[in-house]
Design a protein with these regions (language model features):
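Alpha-helical transmembrane segments in inner-membrane proteins
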Residues: 1-339
């Protein structure tokens, strides 16, 4: 494939992702108990005109939720890409390796502690707690990685760590007495509901700053994909680089878990879908495409979660698993055939 065809393919891929993002954005804004026309939605969003009830629903409920889905979905996908690069494993991801579950455990424990004392827990505190949990889980995974050189065993160990963290979290939440604490059960299953503009502001700042650093690391990531020896010859400090990948992926996944709980398979499935669409593994292209792809995938799954059995809302993690798990199965089968 010559350069012109490659460039055209990249433009087409990004155009497709952008179109799906816009379509799903509008669809999500309109989905719910109150249905509005496109013109009414545009008037409410851009001109701040329209029915007071519809205005409040869109501006105070739907828009914060949709923007949260876009930001967190993109962050989770990029986090998965970074972990796949770090472990050189196509099925590595925050959920599979138990990182999301570790973050969930620490956040849940801290939320229970604060709520039992009638103290509100700020967004920053939630992110810090989730980051600590992510790093603890990552520490266990890295210890296993040193002992076990088989990537399949590493993934299995990560899954076991995740199950342990989830079991402890569920145990604590189940036996909580306070009604507010019991409501943590919905968060522990994964949900984008209840997002506020304050939440959006905090997560946007954290994710944006992290993504800027990830973009600056595009060239070292590309060199690392070709092997540690090649990366060292290109002047990459492997030790610092690997620490950077761990920190960045943990920050992104921690931000997602803090606000939406653990969300499965997005970090694994989306990077592979994006690479298949682009037909390249170049980080400079894959990273922004992963962010867009994660946003599109999560918008679609959140739409399904909200509307299929309305007014009952499904766990977002259940929906992402339904659409993401087949991709993982396909990856494993294809890898087995290659071997």
């Amino acid at each position: 494939m010559d350069d012109k065809k490659r460039t055209a393919r990249y433009w087409i891929a990004f155009f497709i992702l952008a179109v799906f993002l816009v379509i799903l954005f509008v669809w999500n804004v309109n989905a719910g108990s109150i249905h509005l026309s496109v013109s009414e939605i545009l008037n409410i969003i851009f001109r701040h005109q329209g029915d007071a009830t519809a205005y409040n629903i869109i501006w105070e409920i739907r828009l914060p939720r949709i923007l949260s889905v876009i930001i967190l979905g993109g962050a989770l996908s990029v986090s998965g890409f970074l972990l796949q690069t770090f472990f050189n494993n196509p099925i590595a991801g925050p959920f599979v390796l138990g990182i999301s579950s570790g973050a969930k455990l620490v956040v849940a424990l801290l939320m229970i502690y604060f709520l039992s004392r009638s103290i509100s827990m700020g967004s920053a505190a939630m992110i810090i707690a989730a980051f600590i949990g992510s790093m603890i889980s990552m520490g266990f995974v890295l210890l296993v990685a040193k002992k076990v050189h088989n990537m399949s065993m590493l993934v299995i160990s990560g899954v076991m760590i995740g199950y342990i963290c989830s079991a402890v979290t569920d145990f604590v939440v189940t036996f909580a007495d306070d009604s507010n604490i019991v409501n943590l059960h919905n968060w522990s299953l994964g949900s984008f509901s209840g997002m506020s503009w304050g939440n959006v502001k905090v997560m946007a700042i954290v994710v944006l700053l992290t993504m800027v650093i990830v973009f600056f690391m595009s060239k070292p990531i590309g060199a690392y994909q070709l092997g540690e020896v090649y990366a060292q010859n290109m002047g990459v400090n492997i030790k610092l680089f690997r620490i950077g990948l761990i920190l960045l992926s943990s920050i992104l996944s921690a931000c997602v878990t803090a606000f939406a709980g653990p969300i499965s398979f997005v970090g694994i499935a989306v990077p592979h879908i994006v690479k298949s669409l682009l037909k390249t593994a170049r980080p400079l292209l894959v990273i922004p495409a992963c962010f867009l792809g994660g946003a599109v995938f999560c918008l679609f799954c959140d739409l399904i979660a909200r509307t299929v059995f309305a007014p009952t809302e499904l766990s977002i993690s259940s929906v992402t698993a339904v659409f993401g798990a087949p991709v993982v199965i396909y990856i494993m089968i294809r890898r087995q055939k290659r071997n």
